Amino acid sequence: MSDPQNDLIQSCFQSEVSRRTFFDHLLKFGVGGAVAALLPQSAFALPPPPRQDNWRNCRKCSALFFNGYRKGRCPARGAHSGDERNYKLTYNSPGPGQRNWRFCNKCDALFFNGYQNKGVCAAGGSHFAQGFDFTLRYDNRAYGESDWRFCNKCEVIFFNRDSNAGMCAAGAGHVAAGLRFVLDDSVRID
């Protein structure tokens, strides 16, 4: 029986490939493999997922809303009123966190689109999803501001650190349920 490796090496020497070319290629591939093995894995990492800023906490209802072009409908009457923090949300990301958070085209709040019932919208009826699919982190060790919660009545995300849980579109105050989310508030607007 013949050895396949020896046959390959012998065929390389018997073909038009010279011994010098063979060792030259062997050296190039060997060095390339060694370099690839020594590089940190981050050298091959994907670029960070895209993020959208201009998300604000409403001073009146405590919900997170998009402040990019209009103020939306607030359940505490009128339009949302943003505070000084500018939150950046990751979208279209396979990374860690909970997906299915969407912008409501009617009230401009961020709501969870993972249930068949789309929650109660301050602009009437249910929320209407549009735009990006946002991913929210919920690890307490993650960088950012914690104590953001899902309201199980209206299905928006709201800030739950203060004793005031904010005004809910489904009536009275928000009711926190599930995970404690962490939002990136590294960009401040003063």
Place the predicted regions along the sequence by residue.
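Short cysteine-rich clusters marking metal-coordination/redox-active sites
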Residues: 58, 74, 104, 121, ...
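Short Cys/His-rich "knuckle" micro-motifs
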Residues: 68-71, 83-85, 114-117, 131-132, ...
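Residues immediately within or flanking Cys/His clusters that coordinate Zn2+
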Residues: 55, 71, 101, 118, ...
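N-terminal export leaders
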Residues: 18-31
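Short Cys/His-rich metal-coordination motifs, predominantly Zn2+-binding knuckles/fingers
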Residues: 61, 77, 107, 124, ...
